[in-house]
Amino acid sequence: MTYALEVDGVDKSFGGATILRGVAFAVEPGSTTAIVGPSGCGKTTLLRLIAGFEKPDAGTIALAGRVVAGGGWTPAHRRSVGYVAQDGALFPHATVGANVGFGLPRRARTPARIAELLEMVSLDPSFAVRRPDQLSGGQQQRVALARALAREPELMLLDEPFSALDAGLRANTRRIVADVLAKAAITTILVTHDQPEALSFAGRVAVMSAGRLAQIGTPREIYSTPIDVATAEFIGDAVVLSAHVDGGRAHCALGDVAVASNGVHGNARVMLRPEQIEVTTDGAGMSGTVVDVEYLGSEMLLGIRLDTGDGEVPERVTVRRFGATALTPGDRVGIRVLGQAVAYDI
């Protein structure tokens, strides 16, 4: 298979500070990949290297089988790559039509083609005469996407394009953009620090930490079977407990819990997601006391201190509960574990 993008052993430093170390991954044509990580992990630098705005210190980058960095250099304007920045980077004194037309060859800057591009991103062609300051944040991002689509790129790079939008607008704009790119069958890479955004937007997720790719997989794999505790805690709320693993079971503060088969034995740490811990009122399973409640609308996060034997340090776990059943600090509850935990060597 010829990959749409291949990154192999890429390093990058600035002023003696190492930003990327041995980054390697490949992206299939027509797929969507999200690179997620905390601020400063190197994800935007990686995107800029792919776009051709920076040169790697080591390693190679290939687009559709052609090396464009390392062992040769192809400048950004000669790569078939679209790029949408965090703020959209529209020209403030130009109309929407002029902004979109900037991505087109001069002879192709016709009203009909600009209208077609605006319609692709669910904007009415009448928006062509407006200026960026007359648009909402979500509309500005869609104009930036239309401008990038005008070049008919083989690869689209999105650098945290939704982060400046409020929650409701962000979700709606994200859905529109994902739909546009899917219909156009354009290979897409999204960089974000927003974990739910990465999991919902892409078919594959790459978790970046301290300049390295910690794990690449489907959203379900990344969330359900993270490669280590740090990745588990970064990608979502996690309950991590000390345990002893033997014969597919982990003995921990939650009792004997089934664990996924991954070769871990003996003293270990186990991870569960809060939704895997069920609160009961029938006394089944372990028992504990509610110590705090975080109300989140359709769900709540409960902090529960587990009952322990004499001389043992009480463990506190976080439980996600859906529905409107009211619980308050001091309430006594039972706890039951659903599914399997993931075990990690100490």
From Swiss-Prot:
- Residues the entry annotates as binding ATP: G37, P38, S39, G40, C41, G42, K43, T44
List, alphabetically, the GO terms of the cellular component aspect. Answer: ATP-binding cassette (ABC) transporter complex
What compartments host this protein? Answer: Cell membrane
Topology versus the membrane: Peripheral membrane protein
Coiled coil spans: none
* Enzymatic class: translocase
Would I find Ion transport among this entry's keywords? yes
Q: How does it assemble?
A: The complex is composed of two ATP-binding proteins (FbpC), two transmembrane proteins (FbpB) and a solute-binding protein (FbpA).
Put simply, this protein is called Fe(3+) ions import ATP-binding protein FbpC 3
Give the source species: Rhodococcus jostii (strain RHA1)
Q: What is the lineage of its organism?
A: Bacteria, Bacillati, Actinomycetota, Actinomycetes, Mycobacteriales
